[in-house]
C-alpha cells in the first residue's frame, strides 16, 4: 500500500479563502475588520518565522494585525500590563503571545491573563475546559487543524483506536480531547511510556508530536493507518523532517501528512478561523 498524502497546504488555502470571504462580507456591511494582536518577546529565529507567517496570513485575508515586538529583557509585569490593555481594546478580537517565552516569564500566568474570549490560540484553561466538557468555543489551533485534516479522509472515526505520541499542553492533551469528542478510543503515550512500539502498532490513527526527527520508525505503522506528523525538525543536512520516518511509513499507511506542507499550514489557518470566530462571538 502507498499512502495517500494529505495536503495541509491545500486545505489551509481553502480555509483561509473562506475566512477572507466572510470578512469581506462584514466589511461590505460597514463593520470593522477583525483585529488580532500578535506579541513576540525576544528574537528567537524560529518564533520570528512563525510570527511572520501569521502576520502574512492576516494581511492576505483582511484581518487587521497589530504587532508588538518586545525586547528579550521585557519584564513579566510589563507583558501582563500590555495584555490587560489589549483585553480592554474593543478593536482587538484575538490576542496571540508567541511561545516559548524567555525563561524569566511564566507562560502559564501569561496565558491565563488573556481574556478567554480573545484566546485565539485556545490555550486558556477556560477554553481547554470547555473542550473537555464537550462544549468547545475557541479550540487549540494545531489539534483543531488536525481534525479538519482527518475530515478530508472521509473515514468514520467512531470506534477507531487513536494513539497520540506526546502529551504537551499545546498538542497532545487537547488532541486527545478532540479525538474523544469524535468518538475514538484514545491512548496517550509520553516519555515514560513503556513498550511504545506496541501502542503505535495498534494505532488506526497515529498522531506524533515529540519534536525529534524520525523518532517513530516507519515499519511500526499499522497497515492502512492514518499518520499525522506534527513534528518539524531542521536536520544537519538542512532538510526539514517530521517525527515519523516518512518514506517507510508511507508504504504502510493509508493516509499520511507530509513535512513540510502538512500540519503546519493548518495551524496558521485555524488561527485565522479562530480570530474570525472570536470576532463574531464578540459581536
Swiss-Prot record:
GO MF, one annotated term: methylenetetrahydrofolate dehydrogenase (NADP+) activity
One GO CC annotation: cytosol
E.C. code: 1.5.1.5, 3.5.4.9
CDD domains noted in UniProt: NAD_bind_m-THF_DH_Cyclohyd
Catalytic activity: (6R)-5,10-methylene-5,6,7,8-tetrahydrofolate + NADP(+) = (6R)-5,10-methenyltetrahydrofolate + NADPH; (6R)-5,10-methenyltetrahydrofolate + H2O = (6R)-10-formyltetrahydrofolate + H(+)
PROSITE patterns given in the database record: THF_DHG_CYH_2
Signal peptide annotation: none
Gene Ontology BP, a term: L-histidine biosynthetic process
Residue positions binding NADP(+): 166-168, 232
Hydrolase as UniProt keyword: yes
Protein keywords: Amino-acid biosynthesis, Histidine biosynthesis, Hydrolase, Methionine biosynthesis, Multifunctional enzyme, NADP, One-carbon metabolism, Oxidoreductase, Purine biosynthesis
Tree of life domain: Bacteria
Pathway named in the protein's UniProt entry: One-carbon metabolism; tetrahydrofolate interconversion
Pfam families attached to this UniProt entry: THF_DHG_CYH (PF00763), THF_DHG_CYH_C (PF02882)
Keyword Endoplasmic reticulum set for record: no
InterPro entries per record: Aminoacid_DH-like_N_sf, NAD(P)-bd_dom_sf, THF_DH/CycHdrlase, THF_DH/CycHdrlase_cat_dom, THF_DH/CycHdrlase_CS, THF_DH/CycHdrlase_NAD-bd_dom
Subunit structure: Homodimer.
NCBIfam families: PRK10792.1, PRK14186.1
Described purpose of this protein according to its UniProt entry: Catalyzes the oxidation of 5,10-methylenetetrahydrofolate to 5,10-methenyltetrahydrofolate and then the hydrolysis of 5,10-methenyltetrahydrofolate to 10-formyltetrahydrofolate.
Family listed: Belongs to the tetrahydrofolate dehydrogenase/cyclohydrolase family.
Protein name (database record): Bifunctional protein FolD
Originating organism: Mannheimia succiniciproducens (strain KCTC 0769BP / MBEL55E)
Gene that this polypeptide is encoded by: folD
